[in-house]
Amino acid sequence: MRYPMSKLAYHRVLLKLSGEALMGSADYGIDPKVINRLAGEVIEAQNAGAELALVIGGGNIFRGAGLAAKGMDRVTGDQMGMLATIINALAMQDALEKLGTKVRVMSAIKINNVCEDFIRRRAIRHLEKSRITIFAAGTGNPFFTTDSGAALRAIEIGADLLLKATKVDGIYNKDPQKHCDAVKYSTLSYDEVISQNLEVMDTAAFALARDSNLPLRIFDIEQPGVLLRILHGEEIGTLVKERNSKS
């Protein structure tokens, strides 16, 4: 389907990718074919006129919480996880730049020889100048997930929508991989997610989105062209929003 260039439903969005999304069928690391495909999806959306920010997890390289459960100091583990997100951000920057676009990586922890510090006004300026901006190192603090970092950055840059890319095509009332009668929701309110105890994001991230009335869409990143379709207003996946919101 072709869309008019000016008919975007969302102008500025933040896309949250898990680190695992970069692995493909591998058990660890980054699959070049996968990251190049994802970069192509992002470029396609940018070419339609969207301002795009990204947050990428680090679970394909390191999970601090998992090793903390086995005895590693949690703060140290989380700091190592932050470094993993920087590795992924640099890999995505490289993939995007090879496709001819301008990209900036901004880190919540100081690593000046590698990427910029996160400064809100500078980040917004990058977006206004059509530079894809990748936010790395989460919030810069231990005990907070990259979901929390994504929600925080989306609010700070004034995003119209927070997109969480997963391997499932939305939110269900129960695990669709275990229950053939699982029901998918097209739209939910924040209160419905809480009352039904649905797993959308971690509690801190979800609270940030809810309190700032930030619309959140959960969708399957494996579908070709899905990002562009969402930006043009197609109802894909599950939208979580304030009950009376028009987003």
Curated annotation (Swiss-Prot):
<feature type="binding site">
    <location>
        <position position="63"/>
    </location>
    <ligand>
        <name>ATP</name>
    </ligand>
</feature>
<protein>
    <recommendedName>
        <fullName>Uridylate kinase</fullName>
        <ecNumber>2.7.4.22</ecNumber>
    </recommendedName>
</protein>
<feature type="binding site">
    <location>
        <position position="59"/>
    </location>
    <ligand>
        <name>ATP</name>
    </ligand>
</feature>
<dbReference type="GO" id="GO:0044210">
    <property type="term" value="P:'de novo' CTP biosynthetic process"/>
</dbReference>
<dbReference type="InterPro" id="IPR011817">
    <property type="entry name" value="Uridylate_kinase"/>
</dbReference>
<dbReference type="GO" id="GO:0033862">
    <property type="term" value="F:UMP kinase activity"/>
</dbReference>
<keyword id="KW-0067">ATP-binding</keyword>
<keyword id="KW-0808">Transferase</keyword>
<keyword id="KW-0963">Cytoplasm</keyword>
<feature type="binding site">
    <location>
        <position position="166"/>
    </location>
    <ligand>
        <name>ATP</name>
    </ligand>
</feature>
<dbReference type="GO" id="GO:0005524">
    <property type="term" value="F:ATP binding"/>
</dbReference>
<keyword id="KW-0418">Kinase</keyword>
<dbReference type="GO" id="GO:0005829">
    <property type="term" value="C:cytosol"/>
</dbReference>
<dbReference type="GO" id="GO:0006225">
    <property type="term" value="P:UDP biosynthetic process"/>
</dbReference>
<dbReference type="InterPro" id="IPR036393">
    <property type="entry name" value="AceGlu_kinase-like_sf"/>
</dbReference>
<feature type="binding site">
    <location>
        <position position="78"/>
    </location>
    <ligand>
        <name>UMP</name>
    </ligand>
</feature>
<dbReference type="InterPro" id="IPR015963">
    <property type="entry name" value="Uridylate_kinase_bac"/>
</dbReference>
<feature type="binding site">
    <location>
        <position position="58"/>
    </location>
    <ligand>
        <name>UMP</name>
    </ligand>
</feature>
<comment type="pathway">
    <text>Pyrimidine metabolism; CTP biosynthesis via de novo pathway; UDP from UMP (UMPK route): step 1/1.</text>
</comment>
<dbReference type="Pfam" id="PF00696">
    <property type="entry name" value="AA_kinase"/>
</dbReference>
<comment type="function">
    <text>Catalyzes the reversible phosphorylation of UMP to UDP.</text>
</comment>
<feature type="binding site">
    <location>
        <position position="172"/>
    </location>
    <ligand>
        <name>ATP</name>
    </ligand>
</feature>
<comment type="similarity">
    <text>Belongs to the UMP kinase family.</text>
</comment>
<keyword id="KW-0665">Pyrimidine biosynthesis</keyword>
<dbReference type="InterPro" id="IPR001048">
    <property type="entry name" value="Asp/Glu/Uridylate_kinase"/>
</dbReference>
<keyword id="KW-0547">Nucleotide-binding</keyword>
<comment type="subunit">
    <text>Homohexamer.</text>
</comment>
<feature type="binding site">
    <location>
        <begin position="16"/>
        <end position="19"/>
    </location>
    <ligand>
        <name>ATP</name>
    </ligand>
</feature>
<feature type="binding site">
    <location>
        <begin position="139"/>
        <end position="146"/>
    </location>
    <ligand>
        <name>UMP</name>
    </ligand>
</feature>
<feature type="binding site">
    <location>
        <position position="175"/>
    </location>
    <ligand>
        <name>ATP</name>
    </ligand>
</feature>
